[in-house]
């Protein structure tokens, strides 16, 4: 039996096939995502969700064989994508490199006001809320890899692992919830999210 691993990075997307018993690397595929898109300001570091998902799906599908038992997905932390109630991305991916949190906010910056760092999901969301930039049909935000898993499994609402939630900032690990607004479902530990092509 074999396992597939997908890593959605900032500049590239990688897929591997590993033998579950031996740990042997059977196959590896890496593609540049070339997903950065122009924003309105120089500090914006945003990417095309559609392009990322297309490449990640192509890599995944190219690795599937009859003896694949499980698929694991990971990716860049901190960055966020807004999703509507039907599970569709309604924004670009705001990457961890996005600099909106360093913009002035009163006598400080957006990031410093939250005691956080620019590029963290909570800072990006705070800036967007304060500046009317959250898409009107956005219901949730999540990482790009949580969004990819939701698409693969046919979920309308992404599930976020608490380690990714913690990487956004302003997440209480004890109560497993955000401090403030966010209507997100969290998962703890290692769990099967769902199925893709009967895997």
Stretches found by the model and what they are:
Residues 38-40, 103-107, 170, 198-199:
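Short, charged, surface-exposed secondary-structure boundary motifs
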Residues 1-2, 107-109:
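Short, Lys/Arg-enriched, disordered terminal segments
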Residues 8-10, 111-199:
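Gly/Ser/Thr-rich active-site cleft segment
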Residues 1-91, 137:
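N-terminal glycine/serine-rich phosphate-binding loop of ATP-dependent small-molecule kinases
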Residues 41-45, 109-115:
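Short glycine/proline- and acidic residue-enriched helix-loop micro-motifs
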Residues 98:
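Carbohydrate-associated surface elements
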Residues 94:
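Surface "functional belts" at beta-alpha junctions
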């Amino acid at each position: 039996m074999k396992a597939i691993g997908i890593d959605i990075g900032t500049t590239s997307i990688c897929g591997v096939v590993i033998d579950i018993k031996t740990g042997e690397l059977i196959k590896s595929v890496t593609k540049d995502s070339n997903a950065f898109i122009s924003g309105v300001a120089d500090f914006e570091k945003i990417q095309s969700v559609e392009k990322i998902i297309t490449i990640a799906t192509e890599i995944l599908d190219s690795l599937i064989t009859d003896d694949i038992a499980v698929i694991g997905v990971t990716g860049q932390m901190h960055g966020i994508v807004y999703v509507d109630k039907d599970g569709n991305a309604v924004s670009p991916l705001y990457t961890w490199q996005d600099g909106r949190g360093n913009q002035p906010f009163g006598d400080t910056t957006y990031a410093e006001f939250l005691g956080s760092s620019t590029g963290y999901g909570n800072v990006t969301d705070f800036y967007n809320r304060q500046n009317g930039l959250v898409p009107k049909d956005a219901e949730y935000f999540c990482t790009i890899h949580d969004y990819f898993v939701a698409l693969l499994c046919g979920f309308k609402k992404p599930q976020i692992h608490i380690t990714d939630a913690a990487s956004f900032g302003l997440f209480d690990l004890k109560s497993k919830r955000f401090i403030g607004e966010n209507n997100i479902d969290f998962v703890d530990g290692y769990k099967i999210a769902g199925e893709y092509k009967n895997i």
